[in-house]
Amino acid sequence: PKLNAVAFWMIPPAGALIWLGFADFTWYAYPTYSVISAPGPAADMWIFGLKILGVSSILGSINFVVTIMKCKHPDLPLSKMPLLAWAYLTSSLITLVAVPTFAAAIPAIGFMYEIFPRFSRKPIFSHSSGVAAFTLLTIVGFASWAHHMYATGMSFTEKTVFMVGTLAAVPASAMHTFNFLATMWGGRIKFATPIMWAVGGIALFFSAGAGGVVNSAMPLDFITHDSYWVVGHFHLFVMGTILFGTVGFVYYFFPYVTGRMYSEVLGKVHFILSFVGTVLVFFTQHILGLFGMPRRIYDYPPIPEWIQMNIIVSIGAFIIGISMA
């Protein structure tokens, strides 16, 4: 508990340093921007805040790993441990050494492993394949974290390693998706709010993953790297997988935590609006990228196709905002 408290309470001062520095050099902090746009202490405060966050995440990950390994029942082998615990274990191991996007997505997948059996009214299709998929994602996570950086001057060998590592995540992701679909197949499904969010999350996870497979190939990545394709892919993954899985889990556990039942009608309206808005925003951004719209801009020339698609993106964003309200 003390280590956990230390890790948690390091987050507010780190966030304060990052925000109060007002560093204006994008979230990657490329040197050109960091020198021109953020002179003075802004960049130093931003970097120091990230260092504190890094220490916090390392301490939190150590706490999770030790807790899971030491506090589980002695007669419970790792192979039989609940898949949600496996999700936390593997994401913590990845965070200790490398922090790919998988580290944020794995807990959301673990949430779905709690939701699908409950509302399909049957056990998970294959516990062992879920364990294998989490393990594989942990391994390839160490060889995929630089797949955002093909265009930054890495050697051909380095780019090849990270490309293969990223593509190796496809079988693991497919195993999770197949597991969820096979669990639902033949089950007596109760389409309550949590499983609707989980199903939507899997659909968007598959869509984002399909785009990621294409984008992980070096030839296409150099074309789409500085375009809205990357913006659409990344945020479809974050919104579609992480947020949808987490919100579904919140709905699932809300009655257990509060002793009160949520409104099924409002929950389903929340899901439908969020799903429609997400599709409108991030699928359209993929198309914008293919039409050549660059990212990191605050304005764009009056190209008719760009204008029309950005209107669609704005409509989708308002729909998401209304759904979350």
Identify the function of each model-found stretch.
Residues P1-A325:
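...captures the hydrophobic TM-helix bundle architecture rather than a specific catalytic motif
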